[in-house]
């Protein structure tokens, strides 16, 4: 005999008073993106993922350009506009801007989150394949150093 059980859960909705105070701080709305802007190169010279990245800013608009690793050399991805996020993870008490950018290469989609931590650009990359190739979707984190 299979017994069924009912699980009930109380969901608590957050009000502004429940949020991280940094999200309500007007200074968080004016964070600097200077540390993100520029050319970055992967710290792993043998990477099979992203070789380099350029982050540009025009007024309040961010553009991310990526060069992936290919058998014949670097593969330039289509440029993507990025959304600025408040990076609340503090480094020496300073908050900064992080970016979210999505890339559509037809055969795959890449969702990226970029932030600087201790002078290193950290990219969290979620890849989903769209080409029915049977390849596994994956999550990866890569690290980059500034190369201006």
Regions found by a protein language model. Give the residues of each.
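Central antiparallel beta-sheet cores of small beta-barrel/beta-sandwich binding domains
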Residues: 34-36, 41-110
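Amphipathic/hydrophobic helical signal segments and adjacent flexible N-terminal regions
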Residues: 1-48, 61-71, 117-148
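Exposed beta-sheet edge/beta-hairpin loop segments within beta-rich domains
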Residues: 111-116
